[in-house]
Amino acid sequence: MINHNVFKNLANINLENFKDKPTSLTEGQQEASLVLWTSADGHCKIGIWECQPGRFTADRTTAGEYCQIIRGRATVMMVDGKNSKEIEPGDLLVLPQGWKGEWIIHEHMRKLFVIDESSKH
């Protein structure tokens, strides 16, 4: 039998171990994350992520990502600077597999993420 899960109060789950963001273009920018659930085959992960204000690159070559913004504000754009989109609480951001771009975090951000690696296998 396959069980279901409920994760409550995602806005207030405690995230610890903030560390430097490896792809940051802003010195000292830090992030933290917590994976809440992983599929049995390991191809799908759901979790919470937080990041301090600043700018960083992102590469979704191997997996798509779906982001429900819980708090904070950011601008997300393609690697060439085109298709700039503002995101804020309540928004759903879809980054299809193959997307490359940049994020500019304007206000400390928290999001629920779903990473889907199923199409790379």
Q: Which role does the model predict for each range below?
A:
Residues 52-55, 80-82, 91, 99:
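Short, well-ordered turn and helix-capping elements at secondary-structure junctions
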Residues 1-43:
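A short, N-terminal "cap"/entry segment at the start of jelly-roll beta-barrel domains
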